[in-house]
Amino acid sequence: MLLSELSHPNQLHGLTVSQLEEIACQIRERHLQVVSTSGGHLGPGLGVVELTLALYQTLDLDFDKVVWDVGHQAYPHKLVTGRFNEFDSLRQQKGIAGYLKRSESIFDHFGAGHASTSISAALGMAIARDAKGENHKCVAVIGDGALTGGMALEAINHAGTLPETPFLVILNDNDMSISPPVGALSTYLNKVRLSPPLQFLSNSVQESVKNIPLIGKDLPEELKTIKGSVRRLAVPKVGAVFEELGFTYMGPIQGHDISNLINTFNAAHRLKKPVLVHVVTTKGKGYPYAEADQVGYHAQSSFNLTTGKSIPSSKPKPVSYSKIFGQTLLKICEQDSKVIGITAAMATGTGLDLLQKNIPEQYIDVGIAEQHAVTLAAGMSCDGLKPVVAIYSTFLQRAFDQLIHDVGIQNLPVSFVLDRAGIVGADGPTHQGQYDISYMRSIPNFVLMAPKDEAELQRMLITSINHKGPTALRIPRGSGRGVAVMDEGWEPLNIGEGEILEDGEDILIVAYGSMVSSAIETSKLLKDKNISPCVINARFVRPLDKDLILPLANKIKKVVTMEEGTLIGGFGSAIVELLNDNDINIPVFRIGIPDVLVDHASPDQSKTQLGLMPNQMSENIINRFNLIKNF
């Protein structure tokens, strides 16, 4: 059978192991072909091809449900669930998503782009199944990196109290997250990975104990604890943590042996209780470059399949904001040993890999544990350290209570750098950094800022670290503006002080962060139509520069706000509130992301769809305020 002929995963039923291995080769070929052309997640999917095929051989996916954690590893799932022909459109505008999406396929049982949610979701489905008297299977597939997330451990803690609930967790252990996993749990899994399999030991021990005279199945109730002790003595330490938490443990299983995987999954289904199958896979399996560099090939832009090298862009791009941040923080750490960089499994993405390599004693990776990262930093700041927590905007949402309760209320000097703030592009709704202005603007004591360019980023970073309270600095994804940066001597900003970039009298444009450059371009287009804008770089949304904004608003009487974030509760709302609180009743046109989910597309495509390109904004401003003038 050809992969292209698969329209339903149940068509895998009855295929021989050799036929499944041939389909596995076709999946890898298609996966590599598409990702090398248009970019996407590479290593995770290549590592779970055999796991996917073996699992789906043991399930009836007209009824059974599988929840894939994150979605990085779900490209093979997409290819065997009828999306072979659409796969060329992966992560492109109006194409299929890079993550699972319930609206995209009946086989995408739960959408996710953030880690550690699968066990909770699948357990919820299992409980719903039992409540309705149904008998389908519920499976969660989670990576070893995602297992470090507190939510995953909370779900395991719950599932272990439900001994009569059939529920399967598959641990896809490739010894990697996006970067190598960290922590005691990762160390434990490393030990287990090297141990002999405990595939069927739990059942065999139970059967053996039943046949032992005096302590078998007729054991008196009051001596059952002795029977349990005998069983624990017979079971080696492999998987002991999961066994003690109420799961039957099977593994570690070689994750690229289809026959063994099928046998193991079938055995797990028969147990009718919580089971954890530990599958050891190789991230990037089948593509030597991805196997050799599992961090670099986690996700890739377009690349040459033969050489494995990225295809350079048509023209050189300026250094990214993330790298400028990483370089600057490294310089600061070299000068001040109390400054500590903290990340949650995103060293390379946030630019902290530079600190990790050069001054590892001033670097901490907590794994996929954003809540812990925030409160860890709070504790460090209590005793004189200067933590700088670098987390993607979309992931910091997961620690909202900690931001309020542990940092904001106590007014602790913790610096947060929110990477990927604003529109991020092809990763879609789960990764857009559109909410941070709104969700952080109400937190007490926080200072919120965003730079217009990379030079201002440097000044804001030193401002944050020097400040005696909590700060949050948002930076966009991608390249900077190409302005000159400094190696040292960065001048701190005055908290809450904006700047006038252009004087004008017809319209007041107040822009924040990445939208400042767009405001300048919009201003140029307005000037071409004989309209004179005054442009302010706000720099701060909390506190706002009242002394700058209020007199100009009073004078010009027409205000436009620009932000790369959701309008609800955002920067524009802050300006409206400021004007209202000061009894200035004038029209305000807020430009930003409306109350919509921003789907996967290129950043420019998304901005065009949202009306955030300079030509669109200039026309909308003219129409909103009827600013057409005679030339």
UniProtKB/Swiss-Prot annotation:
Q: What is its EC number?
A: 2.2.1.7
Q: Which cofactor does it need?
A: Mg(2+); thiamine diphosphate
- Residues that, per the record, bind thiamine diphosphate: 72, 113-115, 145-146, 174, 287, 370
**Matching PROSITE patterns:** TRANSKETOLASE_1 (PS00801), TRANSKETOLASE_2 (PS00802)
Catalyzed reactions per annotation: D-glyceraldehyde 3-phosphate + pyruvate + H(+) = 1-deoxy-D-xylulose 5-phosphate + CO2
Per the record's keyword annotation, is Transferase included, yes or no? yes
Positions binding Mg(2+) in this chain are 144, 174
- GO CC entries: cytosol
Q: Which residues cross the membrane?
A: none
* Protein keywords: Isoprene biosynthesis, Magnesium, Metal-binding, Thiamine biosynthesis, Thiamine pyrophosphate, Transferase
Q: Which GO terms describe its molecular function?
A: 1-deoxy-D-xylulose-5-phosphate synthase activity; magnesium ion binding; thiamine pyrophosphate binding
User: Is Phosphoprotein a UniProt keyword of this protein?
Assistant: no
Cofactor-binding details, from the entry:
Binds 1 Mg(2+) ion per subunit. Binds 1 thiamine pyrophosphate per subunit.
Offer one Pfam family short name for this entry: DXP_synthase_N
Q: In which pathway does it act?
A: Metabolic intermediate biosynthesis; 1-deoxy-D-xylulose 5-phosphate biosynthesis; 1-deoxy-D-xylulose 5-phosphate from D-glyceraldehyde 3-phosphate and pyruvate: step 1/1
GO process annotations (BP): 1-deoxy-D-xylulose 5-phosphate biosynthetic process; isopentenyl diphosphate biosynthetic process, methylerythritol 4-phosphate pathway; terpenoid biosynthetic process; thiamine biosynthetic process
Task: Give the matching NCBIfam families.
Answer: dxs, PRK05444.2-2
Q: Which family does it belong to?
A: Belongs to the transketolase family. DXPS subfamily.
Summary of subunit composition and partner proteins: Homodimer.
Function text: Catalyzes the acyloin condensation reaction between C atoms 2 and 3 of pyruvate and glyceraldehyde 3-phosphate to yield 1-deoxy-D-xylulose-5-phosphate (DXP).
What is the name listed in the Swiss-Prot or TrEMBL entry for this protein? 1-deoxy-D-xylulose-5-phosphate synthase
Organism, by scientific name, is Prochlorococcus marinus (strain MIT 9515)
Name of the gene: dxs
